[in-house]
Amino acid sequence: RTETMTLKNGKLLAVQEAMVRKIVSELKEFDNLYYEICNEPYFGGVALDWQHHIAETIVNAESSFERKHLIAQNIANGSTRIEKPHPAVSIFNFHYSRPPDSVRLNWGLNKAIGLNETGFDGSADSTYRVQAWDFIIAGGAVYNNLDYSFTVEHPDGTNVPDGKTPGGGSPALRRQLKVLKDFIHGYDFIAMSPQESVINSGVQEGATARVLADPGRDYAIYIHHGKPGFSHNSATPSPNPRPLYAVSSEKQQTTLFCVLPPGSYEARWIDTKTGRLEKTEKLKSSGKPHALASPPYREDIALRIQRM
């Protein structure tokens, strides 16, 4: 049993290869999927060379196909630096990477870094909305969360998680995640990279700011007030050895001092819960720090800056 997902599993390997080839063959016409080698291989003795073999089996099975698919590898819970990545793997997925250090540690790979499972942090929508925005604006490429609003009794996703479930989920959260999707797709995000030095000063104590930018052209800025170790809706540290991630709901106002190349820009503050435009201003940058005052907000807010 301990060698099921190793290259020492005897005749089982041929069955696994045949299964992979069958799946790849059946799905070859679909362009809305990628293949992940194995979920959470770090639990249960899944050998790295077996994972590489499965990736190579997918590549070989698709070699004659007109439409080829990306291959993902699930690396770790949390964040770690990837050593010796396999060339067939295009997406490196992490679970519970909050804060999103997995992106920073592996940015140099020039590959997609994903957060493809998060949960176990209570059921508040704000927690998973903030984790999603934080990861994507840090430069991440994939986000999804455990969603316990879908059950046998509520296949439409309207169940209200009762606290016994290790995560949240709701129609409201999914609407909020669409705001993130629409926000990031409003950019040529492939041309953007993390540029947190754009913010010269102004980030409040206890807040986090992310900047994704195509310098001189497009800037996506995100500010939030969430972190592990705080009781929900308070600033009281939790004694829990794996403290829940939670978001302060206190009223906030932020003035960022941003350094932009000389030119004319438009800055738009956006409500991450509704997508509503809260404030717009035009500015002319001299290349020195320029003050951008947010409207009042709670939990988090996004700022879109684009050259005019």
Regions found by a protein language model. Give the residues of each.
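Active-site mouth of glycoside hydrolases
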Residues: R1-V89, P100
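Glycine-enriched alpha-helix->loop->beta-strand junction motifs that scaffold or abut catalytic
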Residues: P85-F92, G108-G114, I136-Y143
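Hydrophobic faces of well-ordered beta-strands that scaffold small-molecule active sites
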Residues: Y35-I37, I71-Q73, F92-F94, I113-N116, ...
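Aromatic- and carboxylate-lined catalytic core of secreted/periplasmic carbohydrate-active enzymes
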Residues: Y128-E281, A293-M308
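Short strand-edge motifs at loop-to-beta-strand transitions and within beta-strands
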Residues: K288-H290
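Active-site clefts of carbohydrate-active enzymes
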Residues: P41-F43, I75-S79, V89, P100-Q131, ...
